[in-house]
Amino acid sequence: MTDTTILPRPEVSGDFLVAALYHFARLPRFESLREQLFELCQKNGVKGTLLLAAEGINGTIAGPDAGVQAVLSFLRAQPEFAALEHKESRASHMPFVRLKVKLKKEIVTMGVPDIDPNRIVGTYVDPRDWNALISDPDTIVIDTRNDYETAIGVFKGAVDPQTKTFREFPDWVKNNPGLHNKPKIAMYCTGGIRCEKATAFMKEQGFDEVYHLKGGILKYLEEVPEEESLWEGACFVFDERVSVVHGLAEGDHQLCHACRNPITPDVRLSPKFEEGVSCPSCYDERSEDDRQRFRDRQQQIELAKTRGERHLGR
């Protein structure tokens, strides 16, 4: 598949609107939307990533309020996306380096043929009703995200499949027959797209009562007061904020730019941490040649900063 990218302009400080969105819809004309979307985003100072496929759209964008709203209005003007929902949060700086509009086989890659959330899917649960469902002893709660995401935050009592990618989730389900031991399955993810597709897969596997958190963790953190919350930790996000917490405030995590895992301020105190080079999670997996290569890259990043530029390798 192809993609369209734009090199970054110099970063401008300020308050940016971030919109996370997805919508499953039958979209045979998805290829024809790419250039229109790219040009509209570019015109309005919007960056981020949008994925288009025959099954719908997925992505996160950021920019000036008016620019992001212009993109959302364009999408909802398309008949297939009239019911598009999105989650909003704020960023103190532009959280994306570039703009990408990609054409894909799937808007979230599971790799299982004929799984179609447009045909069969689980039952939505609103954030305000989520606590009651996951506290029910007849419910198995499953986190459908990847291991580096679950490492910094999960719902209390959730099963963590420890998957490296979403492609591993179907095999994990098939290898865990104990999931049939309770009548209810409740699943969640960052914004709702992975758990929605996962419910379609679970229904195909014969699970009956399958539920998923509407709007994902992001909507839960936005709507449920912290004092009532069953969420523990921070929520990983796929932009330069790295994580958000209750109220969708920016968290204190950063990325290790060697392994792309999130790290806390405490981890930065480890002797195995070196900015842009290593962290405790990846130090023992790298050779000294690897670390030297990362040091050279980090030096280029620092030089770019002194010139007020962004280094694309980051």
From Swiss-Prot:
EC numbers: 1.14.-.-
A GO molecular-function descriptor: oxidoreductase activity, acting on paired donors, with incorporation or reduction of molecular oxygen
Coiled coil: none
Residues of the Rhodanese domain: 135-229
EC top class named in words: oxidoreductase
Listed transmembrane segments: none
Catalytic activity: uridine(34) in tRNA + AH2 + O2 = 5-hydroxyuridine(34) in tRNA + A + H2O
Gene3D superfamilies membership: 3.30.70.100, Rhodanese-like domain
SUPFAM superfamilies (alphabetical): Rhodanese/Cell cycle control phosphatase
Function: Catalyzes oxygen-dependent 5-hydroxyuridine (ho5U) modification at position 34 in tRNAs.
Record NCBIfam families: PRK00142.1-4
Official protein name in the record: tRNA uridine(34) hydroxylase
Gene name for this UniProt entry: trhO
